[in-house]
Every structure is written in C-alpha cells, then in structure tokens.
Amino acid sequence: MLKALYDYGLRRQLTLPPGFIGKTVKAYISLSENDDRVSIYLGDDELLPCPDMGSLAQGRDKCNVLVEKRSIVIPDAPADGAKPAAKSAFFLETLRDASEEEPLLKVCVRALETPEITEAIRAELDRMKIKPGDRISFRVNGNSMVESEKIRRWWREYRKRFAKGDASSAKLCLITGEPTAPMMTTIPIQGLLLSLIHISEPTRP
C-alpha cells in the first residue's frame, strides 16, 4: 500500500525520489564548450530536485553535490602551495565522477581546475553580489546541469556507496526498500494547519 502510494506520488511529481531534496539556486555559473567566457545566470525561487547528502554534508570532508554554497564551489583564492579545503576538493571529485555520465560537466571540471577561469568566475560572482553562503550551480551551453537526467541517474547510483560505507547508520526505507541514512530531523510541513482549518469549518447554508 505504501509503495503504491509512493509510486503514484513520483509519477504525479508530488514527491521526490530518495536522495533528492527541493532547493532554490541563487545563481548559475554559465559556461560553454566553445570558449572560456564566463557569465552568471541568476536563479529564481523555484524549488528544484537537487542531490542531497543529508547529514554527511555537515561533516568536515563532504558536501552536497552539484548545488552548494559559493564558499565551497568557488572558495577564496588559496595561498601559494596551499591545498584546497576538503569540502571543495570533494565537490570537484564528484563533478569528475559525474562527468563520465554527463560529458558537459567536463567543462565545469576544467573551469574549476584552471586558475584563470576560476578567477574570472570569482570576479563575476562578486560583480553580481553573490554571497559566500548563496547556493550556486552550473549551466553549460545554456543547459542547467541541475536538470540533467544523466546526472540524476548517476546520483542514484553514486549515493549508494555512502550507505554501504556506513552500515551502522544505514537503514532500509520502508517504502522503496533501498538502504538510506535516516533523517535526524524533518522539514516542517507547510500549509497543513491551513488545510485542517479549512476542512474543519462547518458547512454554511
């Protein structure tokens, strides 16, 4: 019964698949396969299904994939010889892995690995007043990487390694049957009180 209800919700886009959560994106780093020009494309208030690491992103060496804070995706220029922060290194590592499924991500990887392009991105983000805590992502050839079905397919497989690596905290989802890390807290349900009030109102003649 629960599985049938869940599948119905997925088909009707009433819920998100395991490993995804709705997020807004403040800005996109817009890149092209044809040249090294950089521009910033502002996002909006639309909630997009984004890969979500859950509580693992709160640790020291992991972060969310594809959509993260500017301070992680494009950190301040490191001092000479300094290694990138662990979270920034992990973000780049996941992009490399995902680029095997979605080749357009290779453009993003190259940009983050090229100091001149990274500095141009940093300057454009500053010009557009994108703050360190704002969530950002990528567009390549005008295509939002957040909406790439290839990346979503990659993420569904990639995320399984974290459940396997931490078997002590992994539990089976009652609906999907997949191993998952249980949420320590849940997102508040919006609009429920209003709906209940509306339902409980007496019928007026």
Region spans (language model):
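Conserved phosphate-interacting/catalytic interface
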Residues: 1-171, 200, 204
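Short cysteine-rich clusters marking metal-coordination/redox-active sites
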Residues: 173-176
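Domain-exit/linker segments immediately C-terminal to small folded modules
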Residues: 178-200, 204
